[in-house]
């Protein structure tokens, strides 16, 4: 668990956007990471990563009956066992044969069944709430409900989860981001009534930022929204908001401000 959390810390400090936990070991075929983490641990590390704006992935070896555990952890993506689910493997020699695309509908059915349950819908909502907490578009009242939802999911309290799904219906109804995450991030800020980030600037500064974002949202200009995201006043405003989230006694506050791309030569 400490190693898994350190991965979140390193990824945040490095300014990266995605963290992956790999469950591969020295066995073949490999076992998925859910054999190394309890449900509570898996949910917690994904939750902590989402609070820092990271995309999450569990790599290696998920089989049919394990897919639901990935769904209930709230992880953004999982690695399906290619040698066990999507490809024929000779049990004696270990040699791989052709891909078995006929298994894809079964994979999706297992995922969808878990996603439609109370816990599945609850953890999807938690992922969105955690992301909105990171970007500062939640209200204080919604943030209290976010914390209650996390506790209910840890305890698998389905009645409480259903109640919170109703109370947070506004957030649950927000559209998926698709291929324009910054456009939707800007829309959530513009449409929020009492976003927490607003507390860290003057009314004039806030209105100035919203005017800029509204024009870019209308134009659906993802590229220029990214530029605004990495520039002032949005950048410095996020810095103030992020620093407010750090415990007062913490020696290091690891938060990521920018969405820069690292140029790496092949």
Language-model regions, residue ranges each:
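Alpha-helix-loop-beta-strand connector modules within alpha/beta enzyme cores
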Residues: 34-58, 99-114
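Amphipathic, non-membrane alpha-helical rod segments
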Residues: 128-168, 191-251, 256
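Generic structural signal for hydrophobic
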Residues: 10-11, 49, 70, 107
């Amino acid at each position: 668990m400490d190693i898994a959390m350190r991965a979140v810390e390193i990824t945040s400090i490095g300014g990266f956007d995605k963290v992956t936990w790999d469950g591969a070991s020295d066995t073949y075929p490999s076992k998925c990471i859910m054999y190394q983490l309890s449900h509570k641990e898996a949910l917690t590390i994904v939750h902590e990563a989402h609070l820092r704006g990271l995309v999450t992935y569990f790599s290696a070896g998920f089989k049919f009956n394990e897919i639901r555990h990935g769904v209930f952890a709230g992880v953004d993506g999982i690695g399906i066992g290619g040698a066990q689910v999507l490809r024929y493997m000779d049990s004696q020699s270990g040699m791989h044969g052709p891909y078995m695309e006929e298994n894809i509908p079964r994979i999706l059915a297992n995922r969808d069944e878990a996603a439609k349950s109370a816990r599945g819908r609850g953890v999807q909502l938690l992922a969105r709430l955690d992301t909105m907490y990171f970007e500062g578009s939640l209200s204080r009242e919604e943030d209290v409900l976010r914390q209650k939802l996390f506790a209910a999911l840890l305890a698998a309290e389905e009645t409480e989860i259903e109640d919170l799904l109703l109370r947070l219906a506004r957030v649950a109804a927000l559209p998926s981001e698709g291929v324009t995450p910054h456009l939707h991030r800007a829309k959530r800020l513009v449409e929020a009534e009492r976003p927490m980030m607003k507390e860290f600037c003057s009314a004039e500064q806030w209105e100035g930022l919203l005017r800029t974002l509204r024009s870019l949202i209308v134009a659906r200009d993802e590229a220029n929204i990214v530029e605004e995201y990495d520039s002032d006043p949005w950048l410095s405003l996020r810095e103030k908001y992020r620093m407010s989230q750090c415990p007062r006694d913490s020696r290091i506050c690891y938060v990521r401000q920018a969405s820069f791309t690292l140029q790496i030569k092949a």
